[in-house]
Curated annotation (Swiss-Prot):
<dbReference type="InterPro" id="IPR029148">
    <property type="entry name" value="FACT-SPT16_Nlobe"/>
</dbReference>
<dbReference type="Pfam" id="PF00557">
    <property type="entry name" value="Peptidase_M24"/>
</dbReference>
<dbReference type="GO" id="GO:0006368">
    <property type="term" value="P:transcription elongation by RNA polymerase II"/>
</dbReference>
<keyword id="KW-0158">Chromosome</keyword>
<keyword id="KW-0539">Nucleus</keyword>
<protein>
    <recommendedName>
        <fullName>FACT complex subunit SPT16</fullName>
    </recommendedName>
</protein>
<comment type="subunit">
    <text>Component of the FACT complex, a stable heterodimer of SPT16 and SSRP.</text>
</comment>
<dbReference type="InterPro" id="IPR040258">
    <property type="entry name" value="Spt16"/>
</dbReference>
<keyword id="KW-0804">Transcription</keyword>
<dbReference type="Pfam" id="PF14826">
    <property type="entry name" value="FACT-Spt16_Nlob"/>
</dbReference>
<dbReference type="InterPro" id="IPR056595">
    <property type="entry name" value="Fact-SPT16_PH"/>
</dbReference>
<dbReference type="InterPro" id="IPR011993">
    <property type="entry name" value="PH-like_dom_sf"/>
</dbReference>
<feature type="compositionally biased region" description="Basic and acidic residues">
    <location>
        <begin position="477"/>
        <end position="504"/>
    </location>
</feature>
<dbReference type="GO" id="GO:0035101">
    <property type="term" value="C:FACT complex"/>
</dbReference>
<feature type="compositionally biased region" description="Basic and acidic residues">
    <location>
        <begin position="996"/>
        <end position="1016"/>
    </location>
</feature>
<keyword id="KW-0175">Coiled coil</keyword>
<feature type="coiled-coil region">
    <location>
        <begin position="768"/>
        <end position="789"/>
    </location>
</feature>
């Protein structure tokens, strides 16, 4: 017996094996019912069915006799003859197998009413006499002298036992009929347990392709190594046989290969199922193609997938691959219950005829076959001649290819190429190997060969691979010129696409104006006391503060009049000689930033200010302080309540069971930090079933982050920074303590801040200094490794099928592409990632999603300037333009290269633009924007005459010396600012309302700046100089020179 292919069984008696009696009974009944129902058309009107399984073999092969053994008994029974009759089932086998089969007698009788008859063959016995007994039993039960016995005609007898059996049948009076089609139909419909095995096999196959084959090819190509196809085959086979290598938790003893993995490149391609890998080196030069096909088995059930990888593909190759991919998808879509199998191939043909009819002659003659216990279930061939009906529960290997295609480049190894795609699919439609993408952007390894300066269609690559090529990949002497030419051509194509995309989006949204800010929320009605009786009795007519009811009691005309503390705008006290004056200001309708929604009677007369004089300075000071404290507490509470009210309800965190410990990262800090007094504590970050939980030793310090709320996840190890961090940018705000945020960060300081008490400088060769530096390096490496292990485990968790739609994976910022700039108020080192532009060290954090960017405008670009600015315009025109100022000019070329490789359209201008009126004009009149050429008004490369004309054009698009007419002073002040933001509103808010809490340095500086502006004074700050600039044609400011651009062209794009 063997439970894995045709291998020999392990040592020991039959007790080492057990047969699942439930499966045996159920499947035996299915077999007999099918035989009875389709005896005339599929089983050859047979009276008996004889199955002879050959001896074990070292070759990898698929036999229907072996498949029947596994399907019915759970194991393969080599050198065993089984004869099924309506009332009896005869087994001719060895004693060990007979002992195991004997346990099935009752189950067989209960299931189909058949008795199991055992014929035990001795070790040196030929078995001929036992065979005669079986033949006589067949003739006796059929009541005919020439009964019809079904057998598998294509399986030639092997070994002495099967040869003797074949001779016995041919020499007897029985008639033989081929029943191959019967077994093909029987095995086609998979039950639940079979489907589970196929799914596990498919998951292993796709995991090997995604987590082993692709990274392996990436590394080979990136390092330009010489590796043979056969060595890749051997390494991939080992990865399949050891599932833990690809992070798949399947038992290795249940796993096997369907066939040796196939790697093909260099112009030699064979798309037949029996293809093999040769000993040639993997060829990955320009315009080359690599085909990889792998298949894994689990519990003897097969799966298969094939992918084609394109290396610096030509437009013709890209078109052929896209056509094949569409045809493959059409074939998958046609796998519906009730359709004929020929319709699957026809669906693929229809796509080819529509998109590229010239490729029809290169299309493979079949779209695949059924798959299961056999790698190719021939009766389920998806070719144009098979009219069998597709049924639910069938599993197919949908394999489609284009062979012998002619390439544009006529080198020996690229003049001819082939393309192949294959996936394992369950009916109704479920692509079991879809986790490994076949999209062009994920299989194209593209770098521009600089020998050519002709227009080349841009190969869309994954953002993760969208990096500038290294000089090692540029083989032309005039590389800089051709590089700039290619970039200009690509940008022109992007401009066309961007204008079309913007026109479609504006047409769909329609015109409209406004700043996109919704109406302010109305807070609850402020009530201090529900009725007069609740007002506390006062013995003295003095100002009192009722902390419990949040009220201020004021003596007015001999009565204590209560005011809710929220109605108090500010309170001040002033002492003059022995008299102390208390002035209380109230919020009234019509005042800036007053909450009118709380003032029900808008037509009534309101108290705006009240003054009291007192000769008790101590009491006056105490009352003022109590009012300020209470007002601050209430304001903070209401603000937090209002913020919480706007939060999106999150799902509940499902904690990991006790059996499976959650992945933990200990002793980490969180930003933003929890509020409250007391010493700040580190906490533990845990990964659970559907989210993260961060908690400290304090019960009230806990944060849950759901995986579904994570928009971007970043891991930034400490290199030149002092911290190693994990950063989560969220879809919706959450509360961290009493702070509402979309960015949550967990970090550890890799270096302790210490100071030598002695104050003496130590030598660089001082042993203590060297030892301390080594300790710091070890600590940094250990922390980075702890974070890396946590990230790897979470990435593995996210790769599970239930998180497929979230598309989550930790992204690592590409430091070599970073540049210095000022995104807010201070200079920072800004770093691109595969999907974002981030700055995660300094607060406030910067996270810009690249897919949300409309265009990028590089401003103040010109000769002689030491730095320039970057204006990022988002697809949501109601969102403020993000500015990154003071970027060193030495970073300009690298930034343009990065923008181009990430398919972002950029423009250059010599001046700063005021974007708020520009976007407002676009929103108000999108048709005019489209008619005027879209974003091309930003094109600095236009003719001089056109530039002169644009100076007099609509101010909504071009800068102008003249101030635009505005309807209010507020708009005038807005138009004077280079960067439209909410800071001005915040400044006014600070000016009109006195915050009765300790002010930060930024708030004090803002108040001083406002006072200087009112008095006409000049501010020396760079921000104020920028604010005083005229909206458009402004002089270039000379900010401090930043350090030069540290990055440079990175390595080749990663191969996906």
């Amino acid at each position: 017996m063997a439970d894995n292919g045709n291998a020999k069984p392990g040592g020991g008696g039959s007790g080492a094996y057990t047969i699942n009696l439930d499966n045996f009974s159920k499947r035996l009944k299915v077999f007999y019912d099918h035989w009875k129902e389709h005896n005339s058309d599929l089983w050859g009107s047979s009276n008996a069915i004889a199955i002879a399984t050959p001896p074990p073999s070292e070759d990898l092969r698929y036999l229907k006799s072996s498949a029947l053994d596994v399907w019915l008994l759970g194991y393969e029974f080599p050198e065993t003859i089984i004869v099924f009759m309506h009332k009896q089932i005869h087994f001719l086998c060895s004693q060990k197998k007979a002992n195991l089969i004997g346990t099935l007698k009752k189950a067989a009788n209960d299931a189909v009413g058949a008795d199991i008859v055992l014929h035990v063959k001795a070790k040196n016995d030929s078995g001929v006499g036992l065979m005669e007994d079986i033949v006589r039993a067949v003739c006796a039960q059929s009541k005919s002298d020439d009964p019809i016995v079904g057998h598998i005609a294509k399986e030639a007898p092997e070994g002495k036992l099967l040869e003797a059996w074949a001779d016995k049948l041919s020499s007897s009076s029985v008639q033989l009929t081929d029943i191959t089609n019967g077994f093909s139909e029987l095995f086609a419909m998979k039950d639940t347990s079979e489907i589970t095995c196929v799914k596990k096999a498919s998951y292993l196959t796709s995991s090997v392709m995604k987590n082993f084959v692709v990274p392996k090819l990436e590394k080979v190509i990136d390092e330009e190594r010489k590796v043979t196809h056969s060595s890749l085959m051997d390494e991939t086979e080992k990865a399949i046989l050891d599932p833990l290598k690809v992070k798949v938790k399947l038992k290795a003893e249940n796993v096997d290969i369907c066939y040796p993995p196939v790697f093909q490149s260099g112009g030699k391609f064979d798309l037949k199922p029996g293809a093999s890998s040769n000993d040639d080196y993997l060829y990955y030069d320009s315009a080359s193609v690599i085909i990889c096909a792998i298949g894994a088995r689990y519990g003897n059930y097969c799966s298969n997938m094939a992918r084609t990888f394109l290396i610096d593909a030509t437009p013709t190759q890209i078109k052929a691959y896209e056509t094949l991919m569409k045809a493959h998808e059409a074939a998958l879509e046609a796998l519906k219950p009730g359709n004929r199998m020929s319709a699957v191939y026809q669906a693929a043909v229809d796509v080819i005829e529509k998109n590229a009819p010239e490729l029809l002659r290169n299309l493979t003659k079949s779209a695949g076959t059924g798959i299961g216990l056999e790698f190719r279930e021939s009766g389920l061939n998806l070719n144009p001649k098979n009219d069998r009906i597709i049924k639910a529960g069938m599993v197919f290997n949908v394999s489609l290819g284009l062979h012998n295609l002619q390439a544009e480049k006529k080198s020996e190894k690229t003049k001819q190429y082939s393309l192949l795609l294959a996936d394992t699919c369950l009916v109704p439609l479920e692509n079991l190997t879809a986790s490994c993408s076949k999209l062009v952007k994920d299989v194209a390894y593209s770098f521009n060969d600089e020998d050519e300066v002709l227009p080349v269609k841009k190969v869309e690559v994954n953002a993760k691979e969208a990096l500038p090529p290294t000089k090692a990949t540029l083989r032309s002497d005039n590389q800089e010129m051709s590089k700039e030419e290619l970039r200009r051509q690509h940008q022109a194509e992007l401009a066309r696409q961007k204008n079309e995309e913007t026109a479609r989006r504006l047409a769909g949204v329609g015109s409209g104006s406004g700043d996109g800010r919704g109406p302010s929320r109305s807070s609850n009605e402020l009530v201090a006391y529900k009725n007069v009786n609740d007002v506390p009795y006062a013995r003295e007519l003095v100002i009192q503060v009722d902390q419990k009811n949040e009220a201020v009691l004021l003596p007015i005309y001999g009565s204590m009049v209560p005011f809710h503390v929220s109605t108090v705008k500010s309170v001040t006290s002033h002492q003059d000689n022995r008299t102390c004056t208390i002035r209380i200001f109230f919020n009234v309708p019509g005042m800036p930033f007053s909450n009118d929604s709380n003032l029900k009677s808008q037509g009534a007369i309101y108290l705006k200010e009240i003054t009291f004089r007192s000769k008790d300075p101590r009491h006056s000071s105490e009352v003022v302080q109590q009012i300020k404290t209470l007002r601050r507490q209430v304001a903070s509470r209401e603000s937090e309540r209002a913020e919480r009210a706007t939060l999106v309800t999150q799902e509940k965190l499902q904690l990991t069971s006790n059996r499976n410990k959650p992945v933990r990262l200990s002793d980490v800090w969180i930003r933003p930090a929890f509020g409250g007094r007391g010493r700040k504590l580190t906490g533990t970050l845990e990964s659970h079933v559907n989210g993260f939980r961060y908690s400290t030793s304090r019960a009230d310090e806990r944060v849950d982050i759901m995986y579904g709320n994570v928009k971007h996840a970043f891991f930034q190890p400490a290199e030149k920074e002092m911290i190693t961090l994990l950063h989560f940018h969220l879809h919706n705000h959450i509360m961290v303590g009493n702070k509402k945020t979309k960015d949550v960060q967990f970090y550890v300081e890799v270096m302790d801040v210490v100071q030598t008490l002695g104050g003496n400088r130590r030598s660089a060769l001082d042993p203590d200094e060297i030892e301390e530096e080594q300790r710091e390096r070890d600590r940094k490496n250990r922390i980075n490794m702890d974070f890396q292990n946590f990230v790897n485990k979470v990435n593995d968790h996210w790769s599970q099928p239930q998180f497929k739609g979230l598309d989550l994976e930790f992204d690592v910022p590409l430091r070599e592409l970073g540049f210095h700039g000022v995104p807010y108020k201070a200079s920072a080192f800004i770093i691109p990632t595969s999907t974002c532009l981030v700055e995660l060290i300094e607060t406030p954090f910067l996270v810009v999603t690249l897919s949300e960017i409309e265009i990028v405008n590089l401003e103040r670009v010109g000769f002689g300037t030491k730095n320039f600015d970057m204006a990022i315009v988002f697809k949501d025109f109601k969102k403020d333009v993000l500015r990154i100022d003071s970027i060193p000019s030495t970073s300009l070329d690298a930034i343009k290269e990065w923008l181009d490789t990430t398919d972002l359209k950029y423009y250059e201008s010599r001046l700063n633009l005021n974007w708020r009126p520009i976007l407002k004009t676009i929103i108000d009149d999108p048709q005019k924007f489209i008619d005027d050429g879209g974003w091309e008004f930003l094109n600095m490369e236009a003719s001089d005459s056109e530039t002169e004309e644009t100076e007099e054009s609509d101010q909504g698009y071009e800068p102008s010396d003249a101030e635009p007419e505005s309807e209010s002073e507020d708009e005038d002040s807005d138009s004077e600012s280079l960067v439209e933001s909410d800071e001005d509103d915040e400044d006014d808010s600070e000016e009109d309302s006195e915050e009765e809490k300790g002010k930060t340095w930024e708030e004090l500086e803002r108040e001083a700046s406002n006072a200087d502006r009112e008095n006409g004074a000049e501010s020396d700050s760079e921000e104020e100089r920028r604010r005083r600039k005229v909206k458009t044609f402004s002089k270039s400011r000379p900010p401090p020179e930043r350090s030069s651009f540290k990055g440079g062209p990175s390595k080749k794009p990663k191969f996906r």
